[in-house]
Amino acid sequence: EYCLQEAGCSLEDIDSIAINTQPTANYLKKIMHVLKYRVSISLIRDRFKNAIARKSLRDSLKECFPKQKFVGEIKNIEHHLAHLSSSFHVSPYEKATVVSVDGFGDFSSGCWGVGTGEKIEIEGRVYYPHSLGSFYQAITQFIGFPNYGDEYKVMGLAPYGKPAYLDKMKKIVLLKPDGTYSLDLRYFIFHKDKVSYEWDGGLPFVGRLFSDELINLLGPMRNSADKLSQFHMDIAASAQAMFEEALFHMLNTLYSRHGLDNLCLAGGCGNNSVANGKILSMTNFKNIYVAASAGDAGGAIGAAYSTYFEENKRNVKDTAMRHAYLGPEFDNVDISAILKKYIKELPSEDFSINLIDSVEDLSQKTAEALTKGKVVGWFQGRMEWGPRALGNRSILGDPRRSDMKEILNIKIKRRESFRPFAPSILREYVSEWFEQDDEVPFMMKVFPIKESQRSKIPAVTHVDGSGRLQTVCSETNPRYHSLIKAFHSMTGVPIVLNTSFNENEPIVYSPEQALNCFLRTKMDVLVLNDYFICRR
């Protein structure tokens, strides 16, 4: 509905709807898998239910748009082709090696080839059940993080450990001479038994993927309520090291084969920002593009572009995605109306509300609040596309304060202490603060912070001296750039701490959601466009 509204058209105007799955893909391999592994009846039944649900899209459209009629074509785009398109077709490259790695989709877990112009030629695949994504998810569960998407916790935990169990990980993930990999399936059950996907306390819970053989190999698994030990940290470090070794094994093979300097990476494993940050140093690729949404959500863009480029030429200048500010926006009129609605919750004796229509003045006032240790909710312009808050739906803090992580966790986040917060840095200063100099607009890479600078920004320096940075340019986000520039003028540090604007919920998208989060937590300041709201 939002996309139709933004485009100024109705459902009747749409020629095609593209979906990032093709149920008939690799059909013969699916049959052979069922016969080989004696797959449980419940798993087969679930797969058929999913296939039937996907075919009812026209019925879903009728329910959502009862007054409109869709007369166009529904196109199914193979899962990994959509992933590859979601990165290559929005990259600034005319030609690149393209790679997709994830859990699995349409019965494959890895896919690679070459993108040229609007065309993507797929050269090879790794087929289900052999999957780097499933390996990483299984180890995530083993460490005691059972929910879907918890892999980022393992990334955050890994620097606290050492890869002491890498030799055992190499018994689980087997590297092949052709650059691919396979799993020793003795350590898993997901390929033959039904794995439950359920909601538990508002969180998506995934059933166990691994067998008792994995416990026999590694040791006792952790229950989520148990305290994390050095053993778990070492397991996390070992899993991350194994993932990186397998990924770089594939990438180096592909570079040797094609000799192309450009790489486009996609798939859920493309969210492993630690590995992404090492690609330039561990391979011969010169340029890397990881899309703002590397996972399955990004497949929507990939499916759309795959369909579009079947009949249209590609102009890199028109399609290159240099920022992720594509979502809803609200003007001061909208915000004023909401503030009037909440007037009783914002009494003047407890809150001050000021309208500051100068970007420079607003930046100065916000930067000043940050220097005083205030926690600032920063709500500006269009919402970000993808999983990261990139300066339009962000909570900000002073990176110089060693206690800022604790302050944020006490006031708002209440998350695990080992998880790092991210630095947003002015693009022009990256080389002065980080060991690598690169554009990272979507916060998809982790770089080492220069040793001489680490003590200056303890709140965004992880235990291993790294930071998952976002580079900020005046061309793509002038208001956020102005704020960081003002903070730099006051402190000599061109960096602010940036975390997502939420409290154990999806990132806020509307002023009302932002205001509710502000009132519900102990946030000090809320900046809604030009409105500066401060607790007294």
Task: For each feature predicted by the language model, list its residue ranges.
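N-terminal cofactor/phosphate-binding cores enriched in small/glycine residues
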Residues: 1-27
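Short, flexible active-site loop motifs that bind/organize anionic cofactors or intermediates
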Residues: 4, 237, 504
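Flexible beta->alpha loop and helix N-cap segments adjacent to enzyme active/binding sites
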Residues: 7-10, 30-43, 49, 54, ...
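Helix-hairpin-helix/helix-loop-helix acidic hairpins
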Residues: 222-236, 240-245
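Phosphate/ATP-binding catalytic cores across multiple sugar-kinase/actin-like superfamilies
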Residues: 237-263
